[in-house]
Regions:
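Acidic, divalent-metal-binding catalytic cores of TOPRIM
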Residues: 1-224
Length: 224
């Protein structure tokens, strides 16, 4: 994902809608949620050894290059398949905000690294997902467009009344460094979402979760 709060939003949405996605999450007898997919945790160690930034979309470009050997990166995908004699089974999914046209991380990734065709771009727009390499389970996943918007960030999947919520006299700002006298940022917004996930409307997330579930289900069926 592009940002650390993106993963948290997804987890909150899955917790609310867990009965619809048994391949992605389940709830045990004690009421504890168990995620059946793993979310990549960025760290200083990953940054030191592999050059992956702690935030933003650049880390996913770096990961993609380790699958392809592009831009001078080592092709770890082929290397480990060769030395283990096993093919990759579980999908690796790169989640981007749906900002194909503007100068944002997704457009840069598509133009500078993935180099997809216009036909593939249309497939991505229609299905919200695209297999990036023919012989792998590396996928690109993007957020759905909402309310007739030409582009969409993951926060746009929340209902407008939630995005307009006032907390302690402050309104929500998506900026990295909001004016703290007037606005609260993504961290506080997420804490509110997590605390109140049972009452929050996650309907806007369903197309994204459906696409994610489709990738997982298809990869699972291809290995059985």
């Amino acid at each position: 994902t592009e940002g650390k709060t993106d993963v948290r939003y997804l987890k909150a949405a899955l917790m609310k809608l867990y009965t619809q996605y048994p391949s992605l999450i389940e709830k045990d007898d004690t009421g504890r949620f168990i995620f059946k997919i793993k979310f990549f945790q960025r760290s200083k160690r990953w940054k030191y050894f592999f050059g992956m930034s702690l935030d933003g979309g650049d880390a996913m470009k770096v990961l993609y290059r380790y699958f392809t050997g592009k831009k001078g990166a080592k092709d770890y995908f082929s290397y480990f398949q060769r030395i283990t004699g096993r093919r990759q089974l579980s999908p690796v999914i790169l989640l981007y905000d749906n900002e194909i046209e503007s100068k944002k991380p997704l457009k840069a990734f598509l133009n500078e690294d993935a180099g997809i065709t216009e036909l593939q771009k249309q497939e991505l727009k229609n299905n919200l997902q695209l297999r990036l390499l023919p012989d792998s389970t590396l996928f690109l996943l993007i957020t759905p467009l909402t309310a007739g918007k030409a582009e969409c960030e993951i926060e746009d999947l929340f209902a407008p009344d939630l995005l307009g919520l006032t907390l302690d006299g402050k309104t929500f700002s998506r900026k990295d460094k909001p004016n703290k006298d007037k606005h609260y940022g993504k961290e506080i917004f997420f804490e509110y979402v997590l605390t109140n996930y049972q009452s929050i409307d996650f309907q806007g997330f369903i197309p994204l979760l459906d696409a994610l579930n489709s990738i997982v289900e298809n990869c699972k069926s291809s290995t059985t």
